[in-house]
Amino acid sequence: MAINAQEISALIKKQIENFQPNFDVTETGIVTYIGDGIARARGLDNAMSGELLEFENGAYGMAQNLESNDVGIIILGDFSAIREGDVVKRTGKIMEVPVGEALIGRVVNPLGQPVDGLGDIETTGFRPVETPAPGVMQRKSVSEPLQTGLKAIDALVPIGRGQRELIIGDRQTGKTSVAIDAILNQKGQDMICIYVAIGQKESTVRTQVETLRRYGALDYTIVVTASASQPSPLLFIAPYAGVAMAEEFMYQGKHVLIVYDDLSKQAVAYRELSLLLRRPPGREAYPGDVFYLHSRLLERSAKVSDDLGGGSITALPFIETQAGDISAYIATNVISITDGQIFLQENLFNSGIRPAIDAGSSVSRVGGSAQIKAMKKVAGTLRLDLASYRELEAFTQFGSDLDAATQAKLNRGRRTVEILKQPLHKPLPVEKQVVILYALTHGFLDDVPVDDILAFEEALYDYFDVHYDNLFETIRTTKDLPEEADLDAAIKAFKDQSNFK
């Protein structure tokens, strides 16, 4: 068989022309330091800020400090298997978390991995943990109410869908209870809730999850947890992971309530990371960008325009104070970012007034426009009445004689305080709140002994459920008060047949 040189030449040329280079070019570096959730690597000259980096053992990190000689990396997850001299490579991606309906009812870590032992989560979508907040023209003003089921909040400091309302107070003043009750009250309200537990004890998170499950709230709730035993990078990233999951629903036109419990611990974790990365410390040793840490998170909560689906994210961030000091650094930062704050006071809590909301220091800057008409009418003067009662109460401790008008104000004030108390995990529908506040502001409780107020309230609801459910239905459907004569007659009929004279 003769060898044809021309055929061989043509074959080689054809193969050269069809050659597809199949190289996997990645930039790699060498780990020079590892410890406390932080790594430093040399050789990643083109790494981008916030880029996801992969270590040779499969662990991931995020580039935070881009310095002339090396890159400071925060490690997402366990860092015990990483050693100096290990290879770390760029991925060209930023950190993303799984999002979607499959997460609802599950407990996940900030990376979106399940930690509830109920198997894998089949999600198809991913969202970056850091995304720009909606711009001014992409937003709508807050106009729809978010009912928490707590009389003291819905009447005095109303919250609207798309609002950011800070819950601030010392430890053990009932901050988490307020948020859990708000989540329980969203049952049947077409809301998705996300509870982000940052730096909590695992036993505490387990208790909250069981509470949500017991009341059927886990059916519409995602729990994201970065417990106190986990490395600081996970505590730092947890709120951003939570809001990324929320944004997926918001841009589908759905409404989301997200609770950050609490941002004080996230700030402490970020301070720890910043100091380990050798960033210059500022006030209280926090880095200079700690304000931006929280502002870029909370600005992602919004009521978006109809062009973007008209969805919303309502945020309830928590801040823990020391001895009621709301003028501390992180507290004042978050107060200035949010649309109002609910201040919980330890002395009110200890004296049995729960939820322990200080009406004088609490404010809702945009929620008033979202309040339903009925609530506006019955609760309009409630805050001022409560403030003047507190002032008079302090004054009367000096034992001076009181005129009839002052005595009447004190009597009404005592009953107001009693009405605003509420048992744990028993949120009230708005129509019931309106009826009892109407009874209070129109003097129907003035002759009821203070000790009987809560019993009166329960009996009134039961009586209305049986005999005057049409009045509840009117408030539910029209969002306005029924005819005052009808309400007056109904409450009077209840009082006439009851023992509360």
UniProtKB/Swiss-Prot annotation:
Q: Where does ATP bind?
A: G169, D170, R171, Q172, T173, G174, K175, T176
UniProt topology in membrane: Peripheral membrane protein
* Gene Ontology cellular-component terms listed: plasma membrane; proton-transporting ATP synthase complex
Chief location category: membrane
Question: According to UniProt, where does the site described as Required for activity lie?
Answer: S362
As for subcellular location, the record says: Cell membrane
Look up keyword Membrane and say if it applies. Answer: yes
Q: What SUPFAM superfamilies does this protein map onto?
A: C-terminal domain of alpha and beta subunits of F1 ATP synthase (SSF47917), N-terminal domain of alpha and beta subunits of F1 ATP synthase (SSF50615), P-loop containing nucleoside triphosphate hydrolases (SSF52540)
Name the EC number(s): 7.1.2.2
Which UniProt keywords are given for this protein, alphabetically ordered? ATP synthesis, ATP-binding, Cell membrane, CF(1), Hydrogen ion transport, Ion transport, Membrane, Nucleotide-binding, Translocase, Transport
Function noted in UniProt: Produces ATP from ADP in the presence of a proton gradient across the membrane. The alpha chain is a regulatory subunit.
Q: How does it assemble?
A: F-type ATPases have 2 components, CF(1) - the catalytic core - and CF(0) - the membrane proton channel. CF(1) has five subunits: alpha(3), beta(3), gamma(1), delta(1), epsilon(1). CF(0) has three main subunits: a(1), b(2) and c(9-12). The alpha and beta chains form an alternating ring which encloses part of the gamma chain. CF(1) is attached to CF(0) by a central stalk formed by the gamma and epsilon chains, while a peripheral stalk is formed by the delta and b chains.
State the family named in the UniProt similarity comment for this chain: Belongs to the ATPase alpha/beta chains family.
User: What is the protein name for this chain?
Assistant: ATP synthase subunit alpha
